[in-house]
């Protein structure tokens, strides 16, 4: 039956439309490599280095290639200019003004040439369109004086030149438009809140440990400035490739990670460093992930912090990510907040520090099942238990054996107490 279904599937694939360029298909889809989605793979000897989807600085490692419709960038020219690097932006700024001055300077020279003003230079009986305009250089200087409105001096337009008056109006209007566009572009680029994100910190590592008897994925965020981020909110996404039951390979699939959206804990009052907590429950993508399986999984957790800059009111966004190798199982963050005389002090020297804590090595699903069956003890600060959740089971069994005392022994003890 399996062979017949496989042959039928191959026939369907041959009949179907094949892609034009098979090189564009991901390698996993071309080779039909099955991807384990039930997290039952054995431990591998080591992981191969992988490319980050997002750098720790927040830069996305995605390159847009083979873009055919490049005209779309020109349809939103303002955003295109703002997104340019500073050296190209300054080059465009200089070229736009220079070309505008040269163009209108050529028009002023052309009017003088057609009217014959260049042939009557120095003739006091001749009334030119622009006085003291003797060539292209003087026409170029007159164009700069007109567009920048610095005031006429040696060169000035006369009343006997209607075409010059019309050109003066056109250049004044177009010059104002160019000024508004280019100065506005430079102002927006200067006032962008990207640099504000440089003072928003994320911990170098994320940790998984117990909090209120539940496994939680946690990371820390902080703000170095005294001016706060207004309406700060945070969200997280799991980036992980997967393969569907139909065999479709989905690279870099994005899954939401709940960091308090339903309870409002994702809205932050970021005055001091905060630990963001994701409770690993039935809806969590880490529900069936144990400590051993964490060492073989390949994923990336992207965290995004958004808010408005208090000084400018502009929206600011800071991003970071945690690879699977940057998630520490059985660790907690070192406290950074201390109470001083009259104020709280934050020690950023220990912002990224963690310490080991007693945490079961089993997945959250097994931990919840053991808790429902009553086989799990309360975890207190102590050396790590061996064998994941096995230590917790042994401790629970020992406690049950201690509670089951013989009736004769308990009765003799009561007799001694009464005596």
Curated annotation (Swiss-Prot):
Activity modulation: Heteromultimer composed of KCNJ3/GIRK1 and KCNJ5/GIRK4 is activated by phosphatidylinositol 4,5 biphosphate (PtdIns(4,5)P2).
Span list, region Disordered: 1-24, 381-419
InterPro entries on file: Ig_E-set, IRK_C, K_chnl_inward-rec_Kir, K_chnl_inward-rec_Kir3.4, K_chnl_inward-rec_Kir_cyto, Kir_TM
Keywords of this entry: Ion channel, Ion transport, Membrane, Phosphoprotein, Potassium, Potassium transport, Transmembrane, Transmembrane helix, Transport, Voltage-gated channel
SUPFAM superfamilies membership: E set domains, Voltage-gated potassium channels
Localization of this protein: Membrane
Catalysed conversion reaction: K(+)(in) = K(+)(out)
GO CC entries: I(KACh) inward rectifier potassium channel complex; plasma membrane
Pfam families to which the protein is assigned, alphabetical: IRK, IRK_C
Positions in the Extracellular compartment: 112-135, 155-163
Stretches in topological domain Cytoplasmic: 1-86, 186-419
MF GO annotations: G-protein activated inward rectifier potassium channel activity; inward rectifier potassium channel activity; voltage-gated potassium channel activity involved in atrial cardiac muscle cell action potential repolarization
Signal peptide residue numbers: none
Record GO biological process: membrane repolarization during atrial cardiac muscle cell action potential; potassium ion import across plasma membrane; potassium ion transmembrane transport; regulation of heart rate by cardiac conduction; regulation of monoatomic ion transmembrane transport
Modification sites for Phosphoserine: 5
Position of sequence motif Selectivity filter: 149-154
Recorded topology in the membrane: Multi-pass membrane protein
Transmembrane segments: 87-111, 164-185
Stretches within the membrane that do not traverse it: 136-147, 148-154
Compositionally biased region (Acidic residues): 396-407
Subunit structure: Associates with KCNJ3/GIRK1 or KCNJ6/GIRK2 to form a G-protein-activated heteromultimer pore-forming unit. The resulting inward current is much larger.
Purpose: Inward rectifier potassium channels are characterized by a greater tendency to allow potassium to flow into the cell rather than out of it. Their voltage dependence is regulated by the concentration of extracellular potassium; as external potassium is raised, the voltage range of the channel opening shifts to more positive voltages. The inward rectification is mainly due to the blockage of outward current by internal magnesium. This receptor plays a crucial role in regulating the heartbeat. Can be blocked by external barium. This potassium channel is controlled by G proteins.
Family under the similarity heading: Belongs to the inward rectifier-type potassium channel (TC 1.A.2.1) family. KCNJ5 subfamily.
PANTHER family: G PROTEIN-ACTIVATED INWARD RECTIFIER POTASSIUM CHANNEL 4, INWARD RECTIFIER POTASSIUM CHANNEL
Name of this protein: G protein-activated inward rectifier potassium channel 4
Gene: KCNJ5
């Amino acid at each position: 039956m399996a062979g017949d279904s496989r042959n039928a599937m191959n026939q369907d694939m041959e009949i179907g439309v094949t892609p034009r360029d098979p090189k564009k298909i991901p390698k996993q889809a071309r080779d039909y490599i099955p991807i384990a989605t039930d997290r039952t793979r054995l431990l591998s000897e080591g992981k191969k280095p992988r490319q980050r989807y997002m750098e720790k600085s927040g830069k996305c490692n995605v390159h847009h290639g083979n873009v055919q419709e490049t005209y779309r960038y020109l349809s939103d020219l303002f955003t295109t200019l703002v997104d340019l690097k500073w050296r190209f932006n300054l080059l465009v700024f200089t070229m736009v003004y220079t070309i505008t001055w040269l163009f209108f300077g050529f028009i002023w020279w052309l009017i003088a040439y057609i009217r014959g003003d260049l042939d009557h230079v120095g003739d006091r009986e001749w009334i030119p369109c622009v006085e003291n305009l003797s060539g292209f250089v003087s026409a170029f200087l007159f164009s700069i004086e007109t567009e920048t409105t610095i005031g006429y001096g040696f060169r000035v337009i006369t009343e006997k030149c209607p075409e010059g008056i019309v050109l003066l109006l056109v250049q004044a209007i177009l010059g104002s438009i160019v000024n508004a566009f280019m100065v506005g572009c430079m102002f927006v680029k200067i006032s962008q809140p990207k640099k504000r994100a440089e003072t928003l910190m994320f911990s170098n590592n994320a940790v998984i440990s117990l909090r209120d008897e539940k496994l939680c994925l946690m990371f820390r965020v902080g703000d170095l400035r005294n001016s706060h981020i207004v309406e700060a909110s945070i969200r997280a996404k799991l980036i992980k490739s997967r393969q569907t039951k139909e065999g479709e390979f989905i690279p870099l699939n994005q899954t939401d990670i709940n960091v308090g959206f339903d309870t409002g804990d994702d809205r932050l009052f970021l005055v001091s460093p905060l630990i963001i907590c994701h409770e690993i429950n039935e809806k969590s993508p880490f529900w069936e992930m144990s400590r051993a399986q964490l060492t073989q999984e390949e994923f990336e957790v992207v965290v995004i912090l958004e808010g408005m800059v208090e000084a400018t009111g502009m929206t600011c966004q800071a991003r970071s990510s945690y690879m699977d190798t940057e998630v520490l199982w059985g660790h907690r963050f070192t406290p950074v907040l201390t109470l001083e005389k009259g104020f709280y002090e934050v020690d950023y020297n220990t912002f990224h520090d963690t310490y080991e804590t007693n945490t079961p090595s089993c997945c959250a699903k097994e931990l919840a099942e053991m808790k429902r069956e009553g086989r799990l003890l309360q975890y207190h600060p102590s050396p790590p238990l061996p064998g994941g959740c096995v230590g917790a089971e042994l401790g629970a069994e020992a406690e049950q054996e201690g509670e089951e005392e013989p009736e004769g022994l308990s009765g003799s003890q009561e007799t001694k107490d009464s005596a």
